[in-house]
Regions:
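Amphipathic alpha-helical dimerization/coiled-coil segments
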Residues: 2-32, 101-139
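A composition/secondary-structure signal for short, hydrophobic, low-basic-content segments
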Residues: 7, 71-72
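N-terminal helix-turn-helix DNA-binding core of bacterial DNA-binding proteins
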Residues: 23-71, 95-102
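Generic structural signal for conserved hydrophobic packing positions in ordered secondary structure
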Residues: 41, 73-76, 111
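Alpha-helical residues within the helix-turn-helix
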Residues: 64, 75, 81-82
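Beta-hairpin "wing" of winged helix-turn-helix
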Residues: 81-91, 98
Length: 139
C-alpha cells in the first residue's frame, strides 16, 4: 500500500492500529482475494476443486463422483477455470481438468484441508492430500 494513512479511532489503545493500517492490502488486492474465496464458497465447486487437487478427471467422472449432472459440473468448471483455480487439457475428444499449478490454487487447497481438519477432526483426509497427483486417466 502506498501513502500514509492517518486515522483517529474512537478508542486509540496504542500505535498498533496505525501499523495495521500501514500494512493492510489495498482495496483491489482485498477484492481479488475475496473473489478467489467466493469461488470456493459454493459446496459443489469446493468439492470439484478438492477432487481436482488430487487427480485429473473428465466431466463425466467428476459428475459421477459428485452426484451432479454433467451440465452442472461443466458450469462449475467454467467458473473455476475463469478464476484461475483449475486448468484443462484435451486428449482426443475428451477434456481433462486438474487444479492449476499456481500459488493461489495450492494455498486455497491447503486452507480448505485445514478448515476441514479443524471443523471435522474425525473426517478422514488422504495422506497425499497436500500433493496433487494430476494423473492422466485412460478411458
Amino acid at each position: 500500500m502506498t501513502g500514509k494513512i492517518t486515522v483517529n479511532l474512537p478508542h486509540s489503545h496504542d500505535l498498533r492500529e496505525q501499523n495495521v493500517l500501514t500494512h493492510m492490502p489495498d482495496g483491489e488486492t482485498i477484492s481479488t482475494v475475496a473473489e478467489a474465496m467466493k469461488l470456493l464458497g459454493d459446496p459443489s465447486r469446493l468439492r470439484i476443486f478438492w477432487i481436482l487437487c488430487h487427480c485429473e478427471e473428465c466431466v463425466l467422472n467428476i459428475a459421477d463422483m459428485t452426484g451432479m449432472s454433467s451440465p452442472a459440473v461443466s458450469h462449475h468448471l467454467r467458473l473455476l477455470k475463469s478464476g484461475g483455480l483449475i486448468e484443462s487439457r484435451r486428449s482426443g475428444k475428451e477434456m481433462y481438468y486438474r487444479a492449476a499449478e499456481t500459488e493461489l490454487a495450492q494455498a486455497l487447497h491447503r486452507a480448505s484441508e485445514q478448515v476441514a481438519k479443524i471443523s471435522c477432526p474425525d473426517a478422514p483426509i488422504p495422506e497425499d492430500a497436500h500433493t496433487p497427483q494430476n494423473q492422466e486417466v485412460s478411458l
